């Protein structure tokens, strides 16, 4: 994309932008978030699953913007999202189980991660006293439940409020 070099060209761009705003609603390309999406698709909240489909103790695997993600509810019923790979051997955590509240355990060697912060809480051979606890973790993603959907943010920047991306009445 080239830089605007003259004032005349700048006014022309401003006029086109103003016209585009007037056409809002006629096609999705005029919607402001779609224009901004050209700048970086990761820095948005995405609806990934119907809320009724996400259960406690039953991990769900999704892929969003190239990220493999595990979704699961914690013991309070809140949706949680973690990177879907165990840092030990790369096995998908979504194939594991929840043996203890607020955790998911890798099916390979039983490394157990907290759903809320991704921290390693126990190793099946040593339990919570393992020397690895506090040294390993999986990435977590901001997650919200709104209007019957589970929303996940995988952005590179800090998450903005989901409401700022939704229509006013949602």
Language-model segment annotations:
Residues 50-170:
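Rieske [2Fe-2S] iron-sulfur-binding domain
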């Amino acid at each position: 994309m080239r830089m605007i070099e003259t004032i005349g060209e700048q006014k022309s761009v401003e006029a086109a932008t103003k016209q585009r705003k007037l056409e809002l609603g006629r096609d999705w390309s005029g919607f402001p978030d779609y224009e901004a999406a050209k700048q970086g698709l990761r820095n948005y909240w995405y609806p990934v699953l119907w809320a009724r489909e996400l259960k406690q103790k039953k991990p769900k695997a999704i892929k969003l913007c190239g990220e493999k993600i595990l979704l699961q509810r914690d013991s309070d019923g809140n949706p949680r999202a973690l990177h879907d790979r165990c840092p030990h051997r790369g096995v998908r955590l979504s194939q594991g189980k929840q043996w203890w509240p607020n955790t998911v355990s890798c099916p390979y060697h039983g490394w157990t991660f907290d759903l809320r912060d991704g921290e390693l809480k126990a190793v099946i051979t040593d339990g919570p006293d393992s020397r690895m606890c506090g040294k390993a973790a999986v990435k977590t993603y901001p997650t919200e439940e709104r209007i019957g959907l589970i929303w996940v943010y995988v952005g590179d920047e800090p998450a903005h409020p989901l409401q700022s991306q939704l229509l006013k009445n949602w």
